[in-house]
C-alpha cells in the first residue's frame, strides 16, 4: 500500500530499534515523492537488497541517507533534527553512486541540521570509557556529543560552514572539550581545512529546511518519513539514561522536519515478532537461556552498524502498549514472524507486577522497573515454514491467532507482516 495521496506517512520503530523499518520504507518509497529523515545521524543502519531484471542482486547500505533514494523518482531530505557527519555523508553517497544509484539532484539537506565533528566521535568514546560498567553502549559515531553541543547552544549547524567565523567557532568548541576531557589528540586545523573543502561540495544540497517541507506538503507531495532508532530509545520516553540523544517519537518528526502535526495522515509502527535490544539498559523479557539464543541465531540478530550481538526475548506487549499510546499508530508492521516458526509454544508479555501489585503503564524509575515480575500469556506455535506465504490466508491458523492476539491487546490492526529478509517476503493484509 502506498503512502497517502496527500500528506505525510511516518514509519517509526516501536520497540528498541532494529525492528526492520528500512524494509517497509523501501516498499513504501516506491510510491513516494519525498523520503525524509527527521532525527538521529549515521548511527542508524540497514541494508536493502535489490534484484535487477537479470536476477542479479545489489546490496545498498544506508546509515545517514534516506533509503527512499532506491526509488529513482524519489527525492531525499535530511531534516533539521538530524546531526550530520559530512565525511560520512559523502562516503555513503559515493558508495551508492559507485553501485549505480544516481543521487545527483535528488538529495537535500536542511541548513539548520547540526554538524557532527571528528572530536565529537573522540569524546563519544571517552564518555563510554568514563562510564565503565554503566556504559550506555553507543555506536561511538559522535551522535550524543553533537546533540549535547546543540542543547548547550554551542553547536555548529550546516549554514555555519559558509560563515567567515566558522574557524573561530570551531576552535572555541574544541577548546571547550579539551577543558572537559583533557587534551586528547586531535588535529583542529586539519579538521577545519577538511570541512571548508567539504562545504563547497555540500553547497548544492543545502536548502531552507522548514520552507522545503512546507512547500512539499502544501503542493500535495507524497512524503514518507523514515524514523530513526525507536520509541524506547527516545530521550524523553525511553529507558533513560539508556537512550539515544534525540527525539525518536512522533513529536520528533514534527520538530525535526518543521511540519505541522496536522500534515501527518498515517503512522505505521514497526514491531518485531519478538523483542531485541543492543547495548545496556533494562529489558524485562530478555531471555539469557535457550529461547534467547535461538532467537539470536535464527533471527541473525547482530547490529547493522556495530556488529554487536543483540539481546533477545519474547514480545513485550506492555512496551508496545506504551509505545502505541505515545505515537498513536494507525497500523502496524509485524516483522520477522518467520523466526518463530520452530517454537512449540510462544510467550507474550501482557503485564508487569511489583510485589504482587499490577503496574500501570511503563515505569520511568529503572530501579522500580528492575523489580517487575513479567506476566506472560502462552500461545501455541505453528511449527510450519511461513517464509513463502504471499497472503494472510496462507498463514497457519496459530500464526493468525498470534497476529490477532497482538491486535486485540493493542487495539491497532497489523497491516504488514514480514516473513523473511527479502523485499518480496512481506505480506500486505490491507
Swiss-Prot record:
Its EC number is 6.3.4.4. InterPro entries: Adenylosuccin_syn_GTP-bd, Adenylosuccin_syn_Lys_AS, Adenylosuccinate_synth_dom1, Adenylosuccinate_synth_dom2, Adenylosuccinate_synth_dom3, Adenylosuccinate_synthetase, P-loop_NTPase. It is found in: Cytoplasm. The keyword Nucleotide-binding applies. IMP binds at residues 18-21, 43-46, 139, 153, 229, 244, 308. One of its GO terms (molecular function) is GTP binding. It comes from the Eukaryota. Its main location: cytoplasm. GO terms for cellular component: cytoplasm. PROSITE patterns: ADENYLOSUCCIN_SYN_1, ADENYLOSUCCIN_SYN_2. GO terms for biological process: 'de novo' AMP biosynthetic process; cellular response to cadmium ion; IMP metabolic process. The active site is at residues 18, 46. Mg(2+) binds at residues 18, 45. SMART domains: Adenylsucc_synt. Keywords: Cytoplasm, GTP-binding, Ligase, Magnesium, Metal-binding, Nucleotide-binding, Purine biosynthesis. Plays an important role in the de novo pathway and in the salvage pathway of purine nucleotide biosynthesis. Catalyzes the first committed step in the biosynthesis of AMP from IMP. Belongs to the adenylosuccinate synthetase family. This is Adenylosuccinate synthetase.
Amino acid at each position: 500500500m502506498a503512502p497517502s495521496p496527500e500528506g505525510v506517512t511516518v514509519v517509526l520503530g516501536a520497540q528498541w530499534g532494529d525492528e526492520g523499518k528500512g524494509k517497509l520504507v523501501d516498499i513504501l518509497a516506491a510510491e513516494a515523492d519525498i523520503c525524509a529523515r527527521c532525527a538521529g545521524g549515521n548511527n542508524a543502519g540497514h541494508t536493502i537488497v535489490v534484484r535487477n531484471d537479470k536476477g542479479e542482486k545489489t546490496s545498498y547500505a544506508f546509515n545517514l541517507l534516506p533509503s527512499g533514494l532506491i526509488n529513482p523518482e524519489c527525492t531525499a531530505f535530511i531534516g533539521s533534527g538530524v546531526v550530520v557527519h559530512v565525511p560520512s555523508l559523502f562516503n555513503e553517497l559515493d558508495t551508492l553512486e559507485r553501485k549505480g544509484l544516481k543521487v545527483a539532484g535528488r538529495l537535500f539537506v536542511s541548513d539548520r541540521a547540526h554538524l557532527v565533528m571528528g572530536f565529537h566521535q573522540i569524546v563519544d568514546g571517552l564518555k563510554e570509557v568514563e562510564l565503565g560498567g554503566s556504559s550506555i553502549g553507543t555506536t561511538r559515531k559522535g551522535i550524543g556529543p553533537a546533540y549535547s553541543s546543540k542543547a548547550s547552544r554551542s553547536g555548529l549547524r550546516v549554514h555555519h560552514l559558509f560563515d567567515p567565523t566558522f574557524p573561530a567557532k570551531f576552535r572555541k568548541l574544541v577548546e571547550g572539550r579539551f577543558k572537559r576531557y583533557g587534551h586528547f589528540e586531535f588535529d583542529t586545523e586539519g579538521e577545519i581545512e577538511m570541512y571548508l573543502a567539504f562545504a563547497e561540495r555540500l553547497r548544492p544540497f543545502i536548502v531552507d529546511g522548514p520552507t522545503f517541507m512546507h512547500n512539499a506538503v502544501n503542493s500535495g507531495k507524497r512524503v514518507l518519513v523514515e524514523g530513526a532508532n525507536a520509541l524506547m530509545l527516545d530521550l524523553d520516553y525511553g529507558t533513560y539514561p539508556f537512550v539515544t540523544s534525540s527525539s525518536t517519537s512522533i513529536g520528533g518528526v514534527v520538530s525535526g522536519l518543521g511540519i505541522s502535526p496536522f500534515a501527518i495522515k498515517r503512522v505505521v509502527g514497526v514491531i518485531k515478532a519478538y523483542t531485541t535490544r543492543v547495548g545496556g539498559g533494562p529489558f524485562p523479557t530478555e531471555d539469557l537461556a535457550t529461547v534467547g539464543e535461538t532467537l539470536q541465531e535464527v533471527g541473525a540478530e547482530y547490529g547493522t552498524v556495530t556488529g554487536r550481538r543483540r539481546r533477545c526475548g519474547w514480545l513485550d506487549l506492555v512496551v508496545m502498549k506504551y509505545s502505541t499510546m505515545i505515537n498513536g499508530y494507525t497500523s502496524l508492521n509485524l516483522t520477522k514472524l518467520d523466526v518463530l516458526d520452530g517454537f512449540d509454544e510462544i510467550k507474550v508479555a501482557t503485564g508487569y507486577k511489583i510485589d504482587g501489585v499490577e503496574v500501570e503503564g511503563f515505569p520511568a524509575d529503572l530501579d522500580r522497573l528492575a523489580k517487575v515480575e513479567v506476566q506472560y500469556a502462552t500461545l501455541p506455535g505453528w511449527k510450519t515454514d511461513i517464509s513463502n506465504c504471499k497472503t494472510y490466508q496462507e498463514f497457519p491458523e496459530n500464526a493468525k491467532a498470534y497476529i490477532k492476539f497482538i491486535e486485540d491487546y493493542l487495539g491497532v490492526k497489523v497491516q504488514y507482516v514480514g516473513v523473511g529478509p527479502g523485499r518480496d517476503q512481506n505480506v500486505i493484509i490491507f
